């Protein structure tokens, strides 16, 4: 796109605090945004071809609340991203990310994290440091198991649909706020599903269709009645 068009977008963003430039074939993060590090609250560069975030620029958007780079070509995230202490929404669906920076747990205001359609091979332990996290979407990755660290996760909703999960730590039932757990289209045997999810957790919506067992078999597990009580109570609440 031409410089004048980009300049016009920058001028508008200066007034609104919102910079949105989608579907423009951008191959790099626009360096012109350096001028707006103290203005921007929202950046949306989805549906481009950006393969990296400039470390020296990205960490300076200290007022940024929402960052979207869905459908790009990102392979790594710089540590400097974790300087964004006001960031509440981070959406990086359909990139090529294999892991998160070790400092990711410093994004202390983060509420919504979308990483669907990446190449994550494990549940990132850094997520367990995020005390305000509400919604986590890790669907369509390559996660094979859920480790013990999951018990520290503060999220209300965890989407793990379309991974390769065959093992789940019993600690998942210790998540203090977890209400919605999506595990559709994984590699779970019924025997590998911790019964404590049904009997001893806060979970009131468990989605497990498309695994290696018939859904009706779930009803035979100990604790299913307790789960249905929570499920029904929640349904009534939103009816």
UniProtKB/Swiss-Prot annotation:
Pfam families for this protein: LRR_1, LRR_8
Disulfide bond sites: none
Protein location: Membrane
Keyword Manganese: no
SUPFAM superfamilies linked: L domain-like (SSF52058)
Membrane topology summary: Lipid-anchor
First and last residues of every LRR repeat: 39-60, 63-85, 86-107, 109-131, 132-153, 154-175, 177-197, 202-222
Primary localization: membrane
Keyword Lipoprotein: yes
Keyword field: Leucine-rich repeat, Lipoprotein, Membrane, Myristate, Repeat
Record-linked PROSITE patterns: LRR
Official protein name in the record: Leucine-rich repeat-containing protein 57
Species, as recorded: Rattus norvegicus (Rat)
């Amino acid at each position: 796109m031409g410089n004048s068009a980009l300049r016009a977008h920058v001028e508008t963003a200066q007034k609104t605090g919102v910079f949105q430039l989608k579907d423009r074939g951008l191959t790099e993060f626009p360096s012109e945004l350096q001028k707006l590090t103290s203005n921007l609250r929202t950046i949306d560069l989805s549906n481009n071809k950006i393969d990296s975030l400039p470390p020296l620029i990205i960490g300076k958007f200290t007022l940024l609340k929402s960052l979207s780079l869905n459908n790009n070509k990102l392979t790594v995230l710089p540590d400097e991203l974790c300087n964004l202490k006001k960031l509440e929404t981070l959406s990086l669906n359909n990139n090529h990310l294999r892991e998160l920076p070790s400092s990711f747990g410093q994004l202390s205001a983060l509420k919504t994290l979308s990483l669907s359609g990446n190449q994550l091979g494990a549940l990132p332990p850094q997520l367990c440091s995020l005390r305000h996290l509400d919604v986590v979407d890790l669907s369509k990755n390559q996660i094979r198991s859920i480790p013990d660290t999951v018990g520290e996760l503060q999220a209300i909703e965890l989407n793990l649909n379309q991974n390769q999960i065959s093992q789940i730590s019993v600690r998942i039932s210790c998540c203090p706020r977890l209400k919605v757990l999506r595990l559709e289209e994984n590699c779970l045997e019924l025997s590998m599903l911790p019964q404590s999810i049904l009997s001893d957790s806060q979970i009131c919506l468990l989605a497990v269709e498309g695994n290696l067992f018939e859904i009706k078999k779930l009803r035979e597990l100990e604790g299913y009645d307790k789960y249905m009580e929570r499920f029904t109570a929640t349904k009534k609440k939103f009816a």
